[in-house]
Structure formats: structure tokens, C-alpha cells
């Protein structure tokens, strides 16, 4: 493998770097596949029978735990995730193993059982946000942000699939969060970087790497962090990470945070056998030392500013009236939820966070919030796909069980035969987990799986 000019020389003095071992890891042909399970949608067994290796059988696929993530697993081979209905049901997320170290940063720096206000600043496509949503309590709130508009919709879809109701998806520049001064308990910034940590996984990334690009990324990372730090309260935690090996984007950013912004490093306890290297104020993942790709993470505590947000909100959605609540009641478990109306669309928000959700609508460009329950047409609810994916649906909603071939046809929006009993809206369910909606008519049923999500 031919690394970019100047790349290996730049790493020579970096903690844990071994030129020969690093090069060997990149020429080994090893491909690491890992997933993280969704605690909101537990599976009786993993891997499920629907997860198959191309040309193989289920028994060929074995798993082993990722030591720094309780719900993370390595897979012996990369199966066909696209044709596993349980992937589309949101029971697991395909994620790079090293980045799951976020779990240790959260567990060791904050009390995750307490009500927390968390911001995932650079969140698309959603790996860290779905992980954060699994880690924080039901009494917490997560703002999942992506500055690029098109990517914010991908983020929204993954948040919906994961099934929680305490997440707001936003599409804002980091500087916009200064409007929420001292609001967040935790800010996670997985900053855009030069991407050298992914060279083994994505060799084409080498063509874009240059020492000049590293400097540009470092400047951008400083701008992003300087813009968002006002939103972190005094005593709050900043978790900074990149998928770059370059010191300019890693240790030097840590030094800048301490020297220029008074941020205090938070040391994490990392067992030696994990193979993670402590470097400066952060932690490095080398592909010759860990089973994963290149990654860097550091934790800091803010020691200046106020401990509480003092702003007010102006924008308010209408609370659902008695007639609307009656139309929605058969569909959703409303305990602890507040139903709100935006034009003809009903949303369910956590009761505890209604005032805060209104604050986000007022201060941010909100793409999605809570659970989109459905649209009211002539006082009847047309259920939304997000409701099918959520974990707050009423227990007695009608459903039709699909076999594997039917489930795949459903996800492809192809025609298939299905014996149905009662008419009307029903969940299309595979292995007891919802995939979406069908509407059963006298002589047929209509498939309401979203066109933009269908598998090809």
C-alpha cells in the first residue's frame, strides 16, 4: 500500500506508532465488521437467522464482544445487512468498533442515570447519536445535529428507526448553538477531519489526504469547537473525537482547548489489554493494536461560565385538544407524553421536555422531534412510519406477521401475497418487530413503506 507523501513521516514521533506494524495492518486485507445492538428493541438471539453471509449459511457467522461497548459485537464476516429485515426494524446499527469507545467516555465522565441535556454536534449518519440515545436515561434529551441539509435527513431516518422519543434532529451550524448559552450538560463533537484513520477501510481517502488539508481541518476543528463551547454549561463535559492520526487534529487540538479555553482534561480508566494508547490528553486507536480502525478521543470539563441557561422561548405548537387525543389514543401509549399539533400533523413529545422542545423550535432549525404520530384527515389518524418504528406505540395495534421472503418484498415495495383477517391499518411485522404499515382493503392491501427507504 502506497501511503501519501509525508504521511508516515508525520506519525514517527506519535505515541504508539510502529511503522512496520502500521503498514502491515494496512496490507493484511483484514476487514473488521462490527454492530451495536439496540436495547430498545432487544433480540432473543444474535445473529438472527435472517442475517446471512452471501453464499453461506447462518452457522458460518460468529460474533465476539467489543470490550469497551456492552452492546457491541464483532462479526466474523460481513453479511448482507441490506436483506435482513431486522436491520430495517432498527434492532442494530452497523458501526465501526473503535468509535464505540464513546460509551466509556460517557460512563466515566458523567452520571448517565441522571437527566442530561446532550448535544451531538456533527451527528450524521447517526452512529454516535443512536449510541448516545441508548446510553442516556429516558429522562434525558438528545439534540442530534448535522450542518449539511441532505445528511440531516439521513440522520433523521436513522433516529426514527432507532425508536426513541427523546431526540430532536437539527440542521444548524455550530455557531447557532450560542443561542443556547450554558444549556448542555454534554457536547459530543466528532469533528470533520482529514480521514486518515479510515485508510484501510477506504483506500480512496488517501487521494484526498495532504499536509495542507490536515492544517485546514485543524483550523476548521478549532472554529467548530470555539463556536459550540458557549452552549456547554460550567461543569459540563466535552467529548472530542476524530478519525484522523494527525497530531494537528488530535493532541494539538487538546492542547489548544486547555490553553485557550481553560478546558480541564478528564482522564479515563482504560485496561491495558484493550490496546488503546493514552497520548497527551486523549486516547489513540491504532489498527495494529486494536480490532478496529484509526480513532482518537479526548474528554474535557468546562470550568468557566454559568451552570444554567437563562433564555426564554417564544415559538409554541398547539396542544392537541380532546377530539385529537381521542383520535390518537388507540395508536400510542400517551403516559408521559404530550401531544402537539403542527398544521395537521400530530407529534408526541416527552412531557418533561415540552418547554425545551419549544425552545429548540425557537432557536434552531429543527428537522424532526419526538415521535411523528401521523396526520389527521377528517378527524381520523393516518399513522406515520415513525410511529411504527417507535417504542411508544399502543400494545393492541393490529399487525400482520410476515415471513422472510414477504418481509423483503415489503421492504422492496414489490407485490406479494398475504393472508389478512381484519381490514384497516396494520403493522407489517417480522419476527415480532414492526417494519412499517399496510392498509388492508376488501380485495387487497396497500404497502405504506416509505418510497425513499425501499431497498433495491
Located regions from the model:
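Mobile active-site "lid"/loop adjacent to the S-adenosyl-L-methionine
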Residues: 150, 185-227, 243-251, 269-272
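Conserved SAM-binding loop of SAM-dependent methyltransferases across substrates and taxa
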Residues: 125-138
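Class I S-adenosyl-L-methionine
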Residues: 184, 237-240, 245-349
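Helix-to-beta-strand junctions that scaffold the AdoMet/dcAdoMet cofactor pocket
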Residues: 137, 232-234
Amino acid at each position: 500500500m502506497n501511503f501519501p507523501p509525508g504521511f508516515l513521516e508525520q506519525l514517527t514521533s506519535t505515541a504508539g506508532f510502529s511503522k512496520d506494524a502500521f503498514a502491515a495492518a494496512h496490507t493484511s486485507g483484514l476487514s473488521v465488521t462490527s454492530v451495536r445492538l439496540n436495547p430498545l428493541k432487544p433480540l432473543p438471539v444474535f445473529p438472527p437467522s435472517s442475517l446471512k453471509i452471501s453464499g453461506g449459511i447462518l452457522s458460518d457467522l460468529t460474533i465476539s464482544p467489543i470490550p469497551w461497548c456492552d452492546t457491541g459485537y464483532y462479526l466474523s464476516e460481513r453479511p448482507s445487512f441490506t436483506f435482513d429485515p431486522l436491520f430495517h426494524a432498527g434492532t442494530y446499527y452497523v458501526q465501526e468498533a473503535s468509535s464505540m469507545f464513546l460509551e466509556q467516555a460517557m460512563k466515566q465522565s458523567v452520571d448517565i442515570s441522571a437527566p442530561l441535556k446532550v448535544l451531538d454536534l456533527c451527528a450524521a449518519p447517526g452512529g454516535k447519536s443512536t449510541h448516545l440515545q441508548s446510553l442516556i436515561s429516558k429522562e434525558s434529551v438528545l439534540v442530534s445535529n448535522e450542518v449539511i441539509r441532505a445528511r440531516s435527513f439521513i440522520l433523521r431516518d436513522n433516529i426514527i428507526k432507532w425508536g426513541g422519543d427523546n431526540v430532536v434532529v437539527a440542521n444548524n451550524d455550530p455557531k447557532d448553538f450560542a443561542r443556547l448559552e450554558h444549556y448542555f450538560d454534554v457536547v459530543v463533537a466528532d469533528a470533520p477531519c482529514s480521514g486518515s484513520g479510515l485508510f484501510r477501510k477506504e483506500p480512496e481517502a488517501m487521494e484526498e489526504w495532504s499536509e495542507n488539508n490536515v492544517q485546514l481541518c485543524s483550523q476548521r476543528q478549532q472554529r467548530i469547537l470555539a463556536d459550540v463551547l458557549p452552549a456547554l454549561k460550567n461543569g459540563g463535559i466535552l467529548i472530542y473525537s476524530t478519525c484522523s492520526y494527525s497530531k494537528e487534529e488530535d493532541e494539538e487540538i487538546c492542547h489548544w482547548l486547555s490553553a485557550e479555553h481553560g478546558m480541564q482534561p478528564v482522564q479515563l480508566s482504560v485496561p491495558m489489554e484493550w490496546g488503546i494508547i493514552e497520548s497527551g490528553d486523549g486516547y489513540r486507536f491504532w489498527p495494529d493494536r486494536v480490532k478496529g480502525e484509526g480513532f482518537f478521543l479526548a474528554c474535557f470539563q468546562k470550568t468557566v461560565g454559568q451552570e444554567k441557561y437563562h433564555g426564554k422561548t417564544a415559538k409554541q405548537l398547539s396542544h392537541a385538544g380532546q377530539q385529537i387525543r381521542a383520535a390518537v389514543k388507540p395508536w400510542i401509549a400517551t403516559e408521559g407524553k404530550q401531544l402537539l399539533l403542527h398544521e395537521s400533523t400530530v407529534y408526541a413529545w416527552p412531557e418533561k421536555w415540552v418547554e425545551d422542545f419549544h425552545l429548540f423550535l425557537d432557536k434552531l432549525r429543527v428537522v424532526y422531534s419526538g415521535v411523528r404520530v401521523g396526520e389527521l384527515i377528517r378527524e381520523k389518524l393516518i399513522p406515520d412510519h415513525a410511529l411504527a418504528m417507535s417504542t411508544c406505540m399502543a400494545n393492541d395495534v393490529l399487525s400482520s406477521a410476515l415471513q422472510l421472503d414477504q418481509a423483503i418484498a415489503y421492504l422492496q415495495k414489490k407485490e406479494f401475497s398475504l393472508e389478512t383477517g381484519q381490514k384497516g391499518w396494520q403493522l407489517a411485522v417480522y419476527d415480532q418487530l414492526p417494519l412499517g404499515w399496510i392498509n388492508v382493503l376488501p380485495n387487497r392491501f396497500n404497502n405504506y413503506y416509505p418510497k425513499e427507504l425501499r431497498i433495491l
